[in-house]
């Protein structure tokens, strides 16, 4: 169960826009091994934990700490059971470091999803446009 304070989401977008272009330059696949995937289907893993993704690309440095302040103002509550059930994937263990707010992370193997993602407001305000990821 997660509770997000939506009035703080714009501040999180600003904080994210300061991090993404600094750590992502150009089109690449990401090592998501330490990032909670909320969608456990083997062929459609689309929803990843935003906090763990930012932590991973920054290696948990001072940029992450600054970003995390904005994140904590959005995610005011998050609790999960140790295991969850998916009709598609059965029982799975929750990553205890996950913080409950998911995001789509572009991948080179999903060009149509990436194109659709470019149309979202989050893409436009969170800094993805400044990473060079979508340039041909």
Regions found by a protein language model. Give the residues of each.
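Terminal, contiguous helix-loop blocks that mediate binding/assembly
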Residues: 1-136
């Amino acid at each position: 169960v997660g509770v997000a304070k939506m009035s703080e989401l714009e501040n999180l977008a600003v904080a994210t826009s300061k991090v993404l272009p600094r750590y992502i330059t150009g089109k690449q696949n990401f090592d998501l091994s330490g990032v909670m995937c909320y969608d456990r289907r083997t062929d459609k893993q689309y929803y990843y934990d935003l906090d763990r993704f930012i932590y991973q690309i920054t290696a948990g440095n001072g940029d992450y700490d600054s970003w995390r302040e904005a994140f904590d103002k959005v995610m005011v509550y998050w609790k999960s059971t140790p295991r969850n059930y998916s009709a598609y994937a059965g029982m799975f263990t929750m990553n205890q470091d996950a913080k409950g707010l998911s995001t789509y992370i572009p991948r080179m193997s999903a060009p149509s999803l990436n194109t659709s993602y470019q149309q979202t407001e989050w893409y436009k305000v969170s800094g993805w446009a400044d990473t060079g990821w979508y340039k041909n």
